[in-house]
Amino acid sequence: MNLKEKYADLIVRSGLNVQKDQIVVIRASVEMNEFVRLVAKACFEVGAKDVVVRYSDDAINRLRYQTGNRMPYYYEAQFFNETALKGACYLSLVGEDPDAMKGVDPKSLSSYSKALRGMTQPYRDKLDYLQSSWCVASVPTLAWAQKVYPDSKDPVSDLWDAVLKISRVNEKDAIENWNEHRASFEKRVNILNQLDIESVHYKNALGTDLVVELPEGYVFAGGGSFLENGLYYFPNIPTEEIFSAPKKTGVNGKLYSALPLAYNGAIVKDFWFEFKDGQVVDYDAKEGKEVLTSILDTDEGAKYLGEIALVPYGSPISALNTLFYETLIDENASCHFALGASYNECIEGGLKMSEEELLDHGMNQSFTHVDFMVGTSDLSIEATLKNGEKIFVFKHGKYTSEFDEYSLN
């Protein structure tokens, strides 16, 4: 196999963990068609029943949104609901032009996303309750590559080199690389889950000074996830994060972005949020504030945090010292949070709870989930335990030896 074939095989066998007689749904840009064929071939090689590809085109999507009338058709929702009920798994290949929707009203984009999400509850439930696997992976396109490497003579080739490197695809067995990567998360996840943390305090020189309470019965996870049927899969390739959910009403203080946010084809730069009792009460940005407004206006839950994620500064992705303008990659270069929905697996018993029960346990619910990066080289994160003890989880942007050597006995 060449490296691209190895990457496709990794996505199918480890990312999605495709099973015999399973339907695979792929969403991708038309520019990715050659790589999509490699993925489809790998799917059929492991016994997939069918591979259904849904292509999109940045230029056409832009034209449709500019009319202001772009809303989902019933058949779009029916497709996802029907395939979900038939046990399908879902692959999203990202790599669109980061500037594709520049100048398009953000409300048009968020209205479409919100409407489609509301029409696809059966599909969403299969993913949220870990009954169907899903994976997001990146594939270089020309516009994206030129954005990342504007001075390169061959930006697509350079971006492919970076994507394969951060995805741990090399001359070795890529699947074995990911099995080893999975094991690297386990010790820290175990410590976090047994520390009995009450809150964590984030501080850095940008101005971040934020206290985040964790809900009773919080669960940290990292690497991949177990489906309800026991199968293990990796939702993100690459991934470097250990994540959980904050208590919805337990976030107070100011939080500054460390990297630009690429969202729906628009860029937001140098932004911050102020939280009181969990809710965003003030915010601003040097560029793209209207995009933040469209996110926060999605629904009531969009004004609260749903994810807290730990990524050490100096991770393999951050070591490249490159802004990729793609959240999948950039979020794994930096500690981050997400506005909107929390993950059901991030609280004990969450996979058996209704939305109302999750809310009662402090888990935010929303139609949206938008990650943004906050990690810096001077970030500190101090945990306060329920017994009053304090321990620095992060100093200077990285896990501390105090945390890594913490005894749970």
Q: What do these predicted regions represent?
A:
Residues 31, 96-98, 141, 207, ...:
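Short, glycine-/Ser/Thr-/acidic-enriched flexible segments
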Residues 356-409:
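Extended hydrophobic packing segments that form well-structured cores
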Residues 103, 147-149, 267, 295, ...:
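Short conserved micro-motifs at the rims of enzyme active sites and ligand-binding pockets
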Residues 250-252, 268-270, 277-280, 303-307, ...:
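Active-site lining segments that contact anionic ligands and/or coordinate catalytic metals
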Residues 9, 193-195, 264-266, 301, ...:
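Short solvent-exposed loop/turn micro-motifs enriched in small/polar/acidic residues
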Residues 282-351:
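Dual-mode signal for accessory low-complexity, basic/Gly-rich regions
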Residues 244-300:
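Long, well-ordered mid-to-C-terminal structural blocks that present hydrophobic/aromatic surfaces
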Residues 1-252, 389, 401-409:
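Active-site bordering "gate/hinge" segments
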